[in-house]
Amino acid sequence: INRDIFSNVKFTFVRQKTQNGLGDAIAHSEHLIQEEAFAIILADDLIINNPSCISQLMKIHEENECSVIGVNEVPENETEKYGVISIDEPSSTNNSYVLKDIVEKPQSNAPSNLAVVGRYVLSSKIFKYLKNLEPSVGGEVQLTDAIKLMLNDEKVIGYLYEGTKFDCGSRHGYVNAIKHLAKEILDD
């Protein structure tokens, strides 16, 4: 590992004592975030691109001064695996969609085929919505539910990022990611 990359980086770990969902895990970090926007990167989604997916989302966040969620297009028969966004129309920025609604793992009639991936740049205002949430899907506090509440008060953009995504939460996706990265290394 190139240690120079991490020379100016500080890592802080916050432990979630019980697994009560992504929303609950994020709520535990409020004391570190305070009033700043922050990024969330879920490790089971590997996204390869330059600029990185988070860099793309941060650019949209800075241009629009609102929360931004990474999305990608999925086949209609796979929408029940993801949070899916509902939109009115694309915004003036290419690949950007102003969210009308967000639905966690819709079982039928998904509002679109734009699925949320594990990349977010969120306003610290999200903590206000996380505080009063009750467990929902899977008996967990869902980040999706907090974002849905946030939509009542402010704009949230779904950004169709550029890059290749691998679902490393499945064995098949993980193996495909390793094969892709190995091929890149061997081709260099």
Model segments located where?
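Conserved beta-loop-beta/alpha segment of the NTase-like Rossmann-fold superfamily
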Residues: 1-87, 122, 131-133
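Catalytic-core segments of class I nucleotidyltransferases/pyrophosphorylases
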Residues: 39, 58-59, 91-166, 171-188
